[in-house]
């Protein structure tokens, strides 16, 4: 957790409402950080449904394996998250650590270890010493309070400079239901996964298979469309918990992902996921600018996304944005290297509403002065039209500054 808050941090945070059936507690376990919370326990009433998506890394952490195993049953009672140590690439010791944590949390909550979910974030390759926090779990589980959402977001931070929270309240049938979410992430952020760490809870009575469908679809245009540094984490975990408590107030129980009554909920969940994903981008390590990259006119939507990610992940594009240099030639380079169908002589490029290149050459109306003024903004939009089809996609990233190098060069020291 940095002491210097990102200039792109939210100017204000939403008031996070209570989700019936969820209790939260945090503690200072001293796993890596001093004088700050680094342990989170989220406790759910019996009957809570759960769904999740995880990293696609071939080197997943021990907690990711633990969660994948437990997810099949679709029920959750406890979530335990630690920051400062990822418990990844830790072999047998890592598996033993998750087992011990799961057993301690289950004993504290009076449930089975199969209803416990774990997540860890921090340094890779160092064994996680569960003795630093396992004795704290009983107190956390019993002392949880329903209104500590921002405190929960703070406890899971690593190099983040601010806590990331989002909320939406919508109708399910004729009844209000609430969706709350927290997230962490600032570096080792790239798509093709879930997210860094993110946890969503709702009081809506939605079955686990439906939650899984909603989450898998919802991440495609949110968390799977953000990148800070093109590095996919070993620990990426996104879990959603549904306590079902709104059923007492008349909310209909949803067991079919095609249920028409899900429309508003699906859109609200999408807003929560997008808000959290963009907060991660805006807290990218050393970031000073958010960058939205849109590709249109590609052969397909998949092709458009690959080209957009090629642009968004290009160090040369990102450093040009950091230097407020409208170097559109680097966008041309990134399109060309993407390995997707493209036609040089049909390519057009915009920064904001300013067209810089058109049909394979610099736009005759190009103004260096106007473009330089645009590049001084905090939020930059880059668009590339490939000119060969109807495929389109949007991804988000941030600039690449010398602070990113400093943060990651000093991370373990």
From Swiss-Prot:
<comment type="pathway">
    <text>Amino-acid biosynthesis; L-arginine biosynthesis; N(2)-acetyl-L-ornithine from L-glutamate: step 1/4.</text>
</comment>
<comment type="subunit">
    <text>Heterotetramer of two alpha and two beta chains.</text>
</comment>
<feature type="binding site">
    <location>
        <position position="195"/>
    </location>
    <ligand>
        <name>substrate</name>
    </ligand>
</feature>
<dbReference type="GO" id="GO:0004358">
    <property type="term" value="F:glutamate N-acetyltransferase activity"/>
</dbReference>
<dbReference type="InterPro" id="IPR002813">
    <property type="entry name" value="Arg_biosynth_ArgJ"/>
</dbReference>
<dbReference type="GO" id="GO:0006592">
    <property type="term" value="P:ornithine biosynthetic process"/>
</dbReference>
<dbReference type="InterPro" id="IPR042195">
    <property type="entry name" value="ArgJ_beta_C"/>
</dbReference>
<feature type="binding site">
    <location>
        <position position="408"/>
    </location>
    <ligand>
        <name>substrate</name>
    </ligand>
</feature>
<feature type="binding site">
    <location>
        <position position="184"/>
    </location>
    <ligand>
        <name>substrate</name>
    </ligand>
</feature>
<feature type="binding site">
    <location>
        <position position="158"/>
    </location>
    <ligand>
        <name>substrate</name>
    </ligand>
</feature>
<comment type="similarity">
    <text>Belongs to the ArgJ family.</text>
</comment>
<feature type="active site" description="Nucleophile">
    <location>
        <position position="195"/>
    </location>
</feature>
<dbReference type="GO" id="GO:0006526">
    <property type="term" value="P:L-arginine biosynthetic process"/>
</dbReference>
<dbReference type="GO" id="GO:0004042">
    <property type="term" value="F:L-glutamate N-acetyltransferase activity"/>
</dbReference>
<dbReference type="Pfam" id="PF01960">
    <property type="entry name" value="ArgJ"/>
</dbReference>
<dbReference type="InterPro" id="IPR016117">
    <property type="entry name" value="ArgJ-like_dom_sf"/>
</dbReference>
<dbReference type="GO" id="GO:0005737">
    <property type="term" value="C:cytoplasm"/>
</dbReference>
<feature type="site" description="Involved in the stabilization of negative charge on the oxyanion by the formation of the oxyanion hole">
    <location>
        <position position="121"/>
    </location>
</feature>
<feature type="site" description="Cleavage; by autolysis">
    <location>
        <begin position="194"/>
        <end position="195"/>
    </location>
</feature>
<comment type="function">
    <text>Catalyzes two activities which are involved in the cyclic version of arginine biosynthesis: the synthesis of N-acetylglutamate from glutamate and acetyl-CoA as the acetyl donor, and of ornithine by transacetylation between N(2)-acetylornithine and glutamate.</text>
</comment>
<keyword id="KW-0808">Transferase</keyword>
<keyword id="KW-0055">Arginine biosynthesis</keyword>
<keyword id="KW-0963">Cytoplasm</keyword>
<keyword id="KW-0068">Autocatalytic cleavage</keyword>
<feature type="binding site">
    <location>
        <position position="285"/>
    </location>
    <ligand>
        <name>substrate</name>
    </ligand>
</feature>
<feature type="binding site">
    <location>
        <position position="413"/>
    </location>
    <ligand>
        <name>substrate</name>
    </ligand>
</feature>
<comment type="pathway">
    <text>Amino-acid biosynthesis; L-arginine biosynthesis; L-ornithine and N-acetyl-L-glutamate from L-glutamate and N(2)-acetyl-L-ornithine (cyclic): step 1/1.</text>
</comment>
<keyword id="KW-0028">Amino-acid biosynthesis</keyword>
<feature type="site" description="Involved in the stabilization of negative charge on the oxyanion by the formation of the oxyanion hole">
    <location>
        <position position="122"/>
    </location>
</feature>
<keyword id="KW-0511">Multifunctional enzyme</keyword>
<protein>
    <recommendedName>
        <fullName>Arginine biosynthesis bifunctional protein ArgJ</fullName>
        <ecNumber>2.3.1.35</ecNumber>
        <ecNumber>2.3.1.1</ecNumber>
    </recommendedName>
</protein>
<keyword id="KW-0012">Acyltransferase</keyword>
């Amino acid at each position: 957790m940095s002491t210097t808050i990102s200039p792109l941090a939210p100017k204000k945070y939403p008031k996070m409402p209570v989700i019936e059936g969820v209790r939260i507690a945090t503690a200072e376990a001293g796993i890596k950080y001093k004088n700050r919370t680094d342990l989170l326990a989220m406790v759910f009433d019996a009957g809570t449904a759960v769904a999740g998506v995880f990293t696609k890394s071939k080197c997943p952490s021990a907690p990711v394996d633990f969660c994948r195993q437990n997810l099949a049953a679709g029920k959750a009672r406890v979530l335990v998250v630690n920051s400062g140590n990822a418990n990844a690439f830790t072999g047998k010791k890592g598996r033993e650590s998750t087992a011990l944590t799961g057993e301690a949390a289950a004993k504290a909550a009076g449930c089975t270890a199969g209803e416990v979910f774990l997540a860890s974030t921090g340094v890779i390759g160092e064994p996680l010493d569960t003795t630093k926090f396992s004795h704290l779990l009983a107190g956390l589980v019993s002392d949880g309070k329903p209104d500590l959402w921002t405190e929960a977001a703070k406890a899971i931070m690593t190099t983040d400079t601010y806590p990331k929270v989002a909320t939406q309240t919508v109708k399910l049938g004729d009844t209000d239901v609430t969706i709350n979410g927290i997230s962490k992430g600032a570096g080792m952020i790239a798509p093709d996964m879930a997210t860094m760490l993110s946890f969503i809870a709702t009081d809506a009575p939605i079955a686990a298979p439906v939650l899984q469908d909603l989450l898998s679809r919802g991440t495609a245009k949110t968390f799977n469309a953000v990148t800070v540094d093109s590095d996919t984490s070993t620990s990426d975990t996104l879990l959603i918990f549904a306590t079902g408590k709104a059923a007492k107030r008349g909310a209909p129980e949803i067991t079919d992902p095609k249920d028409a009554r899900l429309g508003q909920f699906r859109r609200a969940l999408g807003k929560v996921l997008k808000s959290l994903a963009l907060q991660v981008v805006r807290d990218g390590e050393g970031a000073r600018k958010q960058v939205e990259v849109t590709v249109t006119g590609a052969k397909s939507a998949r092709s458009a996304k690959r080209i957009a990610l090629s642009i968004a992940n290009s160090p040369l594009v990102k450093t040009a944005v950091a230097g407020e240099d409208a170097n559109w030639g680097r966008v041309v380079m990134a399109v060309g290297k993407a390995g997707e169908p493209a036609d040089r002589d049909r390519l057009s490029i915009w920064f904001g509403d300013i067209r810089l290149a058109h049909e394979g050459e610099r736009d005759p109306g190009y103004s260096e002065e106007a473009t330089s003024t645009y590049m001084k903004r905090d939020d930059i939009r880059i668009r590339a039209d490939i000119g060969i089809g109807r495929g389109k996609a949007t991804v988000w990233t941030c600039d690449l500054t010398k602070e990113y190098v400093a943060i990651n060069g000093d991370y373990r020291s």
